[in-house]
Amino acid sequence: ACFPTQVKLCPPPAFKAECVIINAVECEPYLTADHQLMLEHAEEIMVGVSILMKAVKVNKAFIGIENNKPDAIQLMTKVAAGYAGIEVVPLKVQYPQGGEKQLIDAVISRQVAAGALPISTGAVVQNVGTAFAVYQAVQKNKPLFERVITVTGKSLSKPSNFLARIGTPMKQLIDACGGLP
């Protein structure tokens, strides 16, 4: 997380991208933001994936989704059928599969050597939220100032996902979930 998108899209000259991998595996077990984003914006995400493929000059992309999200797998597979070179890859639920190196291994069976960059495997990995943000930036001329986030936990009466502006105080989101006891 927090690795600049433009750096991943411009790998060092010694490396050549062979595919894009979209990380649709929530990095923590209680998160559901990516799941909700896929259910609500599958078409836009596919357009974003296509744009990412063009940016790194590849004709193959994989979207890794854990198999405990069958509705997202079904929808994303249906939508991907309309796009050349995009394949949804159902993955076994295995923490921490959302890590970039683990995801590369799970999707294309290549390991990132110790001290090496993920691009050394030929894969450029981006998050499903990034694919959606790329769609919005390129197709809608909308800068990234908000994102879907999950606010959850046993102390909340109504755990929820929110489309929140970057910088929204956590107290405001917690209060929207019924507050803390």
Segments the model singles out, each with a brief description of its role:
Residues 25-31, 56-57, 111-112:
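Acidic/polar active-site rim loop that often engages polyanionic ligands
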Residues 14-25, 47:
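N-terminal glycine-rich anion-binding loops that anchor highly charged ligand groups
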Residues 39-55:
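Histidine-anchored nucleotide/phosphate-binding helix
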Residues 2-17:
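Short amphipathic alpha-helices and their capping/turn segments at secondary-structure boundaries
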Residues 27-28, 51-55, 62-68:
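Short connector loops at secondary-structure junctions
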Residues 10, 59-170, 176-181:
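Hydrophobic alpha-helical positions that pack around
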Residues 20-34, 155:
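Gly-rich Lys/Arg/Thr-decorated short loops/hinges at beta-loop-alpha junctions or inter-strand turns
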Residues 33-44, 165:
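Short alpha-helix boundary/capping segments
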